Amino acid sequence: MAKGKRTFQPNNRRRARVHGFRLRMRTRAGRAIVTGRRRKGRRALTA
């Protein structure tokens, strides 16, 4: 059985653009995510 290729191809720029802090701050829902993570005491708020 042939398996497909690995789907995770790391790329720091894309990671930041898709999950980064500036993207989160753009929308109300994104700000809510960051607020919730701050309240919970997460070490990393965003990627």
UniProtKB/Swiss-Prot annotation:
Superkingdom, taxonomy of origin: Bacteria
GO (cellular component) term, any one: ribonucleoprotein complex
Pfam families (UniProt xref): Ribosomal_L34
InterPro entries documented for this protein: Ribosomal_bL34, Ribosomal_bL34_CS
Gene Ontology terms: biological process: translation
Molecular function, one GO term: structural constituent of ribosome
Keywords: Ribonucleoprotein, Ribosomal protein
Family: Belongs to the bacterial ribosomal protein bL34 family.
Protein's name in the database: Large ribosomal subunit protein bL34
Organism: Mycobacterium marinum (strain ATCC BAA-535 / M)
Encoding gene per record: rpmH
